[in-house]
Structures are given as C-alpha cells and as structure tokens.
Amino acid sequence: MKNIILALLCVGVFTSSSFGQGCVAVRHMSCSAGTGANSNSMMHPGQWQVSLGFRNLHSYKHYVGADYQPQREAAGTNVINDSQSFDLGATYSVTDRLLLAVNLPLNFNYRTSLYEHYGNALNVNPAQKRFGTMANGIGDARLTASYWVLDPLKHMKGNFSVGLGLKLPTGDSKAMDKFHRRASDGSDYTIEKPVDQSIQLGDGGVGINLEIQGYQQLFSRTSLYYNGFYMSNPRNVNDAANVAPDKVVTDEMVRYMSVADQYAGRVGLNYALAPKAGIGATLGARIEGVPAYDLIGGSDGFRRPGYIFSIEPGISYSTAKNTFFV
C-alpha cells in the first residue's frame, strides 16, 4: 500500500534585515521536495509527502545600496510591507532517488505608504496621511523533478539532490487596488491601478527553476543542511502598468513591470536535542533576492532588485509520519 506522509507543517516568523532598495520584489519560494535536513527526510517509491509552510515578513526599513536611511522612518515617509505566505506542496517518490513535486503559494500582502497616494511632501500631504493597498490570492505554481545524486540507501549520513522545474504564471501579475489622490480643494478621490511590484501575486512569466538541497551529518547529533534555487524568467516585461494613469510616462523603459529572475539560498545546523522524543533545534541563515539583470532574456521594465538576509532559529518535532517546524 502506498504511504502518505504529512511533513513540514510549520510556522515560521522571521525577523529580516533587508539590504538594497526600500522594497525588494521577492516572492515567497522554497525548494520543492521537503527539507533534506537528514536521512529521515528520505522517501521510498510510492510514498507521498504533503507539506504546508507559513512565513510572515514585515519590511519597513529603507536602504540605498548598503546605506541605511533612518530619516525615512523618522519622518514617517517609509514604506511598510506586510506579507503572509502559505506554501502548499505535494511530493511523490517515483524511485528512491527521483521525486516529483508541485508547490502552490497562497499570499496575503498589504502595503502602506505616503508617496503612492497624496505624496510625501507637506505641501501636497499636509496631514501626512498614509494609505494602504493589498493583493491576496494564489501565487505562481511550481512543478519540479529532483534527483538524489548519491544512492540514499548507501549514503545515510550525507547526500544532495538537484532539481529542475517550471514556474507557471498562475498568480495575478496585475492585481489592482485603489490609490488615493488629493484634489486642489483638499477633497479625496481614488484611482485604480496595479499595486506595487513588491506585493504582486505573480510576475506573468513562465520560469525555469534550478535547485539543489542536501545534508551532511557532522557529529552524532548535529547535521548540516543547505538548499537553494535560481529561477530564470526569460520573459522581458508583463502587461502590468508601472505608471499611474494620471501620471506622465517619462521613460518608456519602465512603462511596464519587469519579469525578473529570483534566487535564494539557505544553510544551517540541525541538532537533535532529544532524539528519542523527536525534538530538535535548528539555526540557519537565508539570503534571497532579485538581480538587476536577468540570466536569460531581456531586463527591461520596472523592477526592484536587491536582497534580503534572514536569521532562522527553530524548533522541530518529529513522529513516524509527521514533522513540525517552528
């Protein structure tokens, strides 16, 4: 009988320090097939693994390059992004080494600012009013095939897999919301346009995803884990307008939003605190970002390049068929 394993039902709330632009258009993504943290994550032919991951991201600091801009927060003109993401996944083990996976994110994004509405300056926004926009729904789905390079039955203490997949444009790349404007008489009215790229649900392109993940036992209770991916988006721009309809387009290059590449990498240690009870602790680091130029295809359009660095402490609990991470 085929086995069904419920794995990686986790809640992750991470405090992230962002370096780069004030808003980096990074969408929640992870490696497709489990955690690869140790040999216990191995699957056998015919097994299914169902996963659910949650991540909360709060962004409020501004950088220009590596230079932090505290004056934006002091003046109250900083942009604040809040994103909650659920990553739903299912993995099927074709053989001991070949895995097929599908992942679908569910995103709830909210953004507040001054400059996108009345403006930052006192003469146009005397009360310094802040307004919000949002985009909620499914993101871009991913289909991935991955392969353990070493025979899992012979290399229990260390192994790594490589994967190749497609990212499909199932998320709305032109999510709309209302933006506030202040008339000359001080009255308020709204216009509708696409929300900022940093909270869009999708990018509108078919991407090619290359990933790697693995583990290595270091000591009797300690193992190293690592994973990462690079997602290439050959499409140049999508049809989401970057410039508001009441503004003049001064640069045709950024009239529409760019369909940008994305990357991420994670590395950390997993320590078995109480092996018999299935309790462990993890400490890792994550970097994720958007490059200024794509690997394949054009790099036109408006994009928010930069990267986010996060520290990821955690506690895990494992049973015969379930693994929970917090």
List where the protein language model places each region.
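Transmembrane beta-strands of outer-membrane beta-barrel proteins
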Residues: 48-52, 100-102, 143, 158-164, ...
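Residues on the lipid-exposed face of transmembrane beta-strands in outer-membrane beta-barrel proteins
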Residues: 39-41, 52-54, 88-92, 102, ...
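Surface-exposed strand-loop-strand hairpins of Gram-negative outer-membrane beta-barrel proteins
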Residues: 26, 56-85, 198-201
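Transmembrane beta-strands of outer-membrane beta-barrel pores
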Residues: 54-60, 104-110, 140, 149, ...
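Extracellular loop and loop/strand-boundary signature of outer-membrane beta-barrel proteins
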Residues: 37, 71-76, 125-133, 195-200, ...
